[in-house]
Amino acid sequence: YYASRGLGDVYKRQLTTRHDRYTVFSLWDTFRNVHPFFTLAYPQKQLDMVQTLIDMYKEWGWLPRWELYGNETLTMSGDPAIIMLADTWLRGLKKFDAETAYEAMIKSATAPGSENILRTDNDDYMKLGYVPLREQFDNSVSHALEYYLADFALSRFAESLGHKEDAQTFAKRSLGYKHYYCKEFGTLRPI
């Protein structure tokens, strides 16, 4: 899959896993309930899954969003691996490579859109604090809301690692959802 995007030949990559390796991550769906549950009920499996994500970053250069049998599908939106990794750490499961995880999170949250396979609209998001509506039904609000969640999780993770300036930056960015709030209708709307 990555070969078609010019990011390397997936068939020649060296796997880095030294533990149970997992696949078929539907992180867009599972970061909300499955992975928090695993931190409580199956902590070792959760740690192996976390390390699998970090290994995928080492192999591919990006955290996965919706990985399927060793290939990133880029299905759905957002940056859910950040949330899953940070949530695991903040719940006290810390036996994983936090600095590499942090490096991967920062890359995803800050790389320009033209270079970013997870946040292709990151230029507007970083400059304006939101993703503007470009065409009807473009999902700009849902993209940005997913980024705000990831940035909040990243701010908490950064704070726990002692990266205070990054923590403040991402906490501030996470409040951008307020751009979308429409008082007249009491809902979030595209801008």
Can you say where each PLM-predicted feature lies in the sequence?
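Catalytic cores of carbohydrate-active enzymes
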Residues: 64, 155, 161-191
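Single conserved hydrophobic/aromatic residue that forms the stacking wall/gate
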Residues: 1-7, 11
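Helix-terminus loop motifs that line ligand-binding clefts
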Residues: 45-125, 185, 189-191
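Alpha-helical support elements that line or immediately flank enzyme active sites
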Residues: 23-46, 86-91, 152-161
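Solvent-exposed loop and edge beta-strand segments that line ligand/cofactor-binding
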Residues: 19-26, 70-78, 136-147
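Active-site-proximal structural scaffolding
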Residues: 26-30, 42-46, 77-82, 94, ...
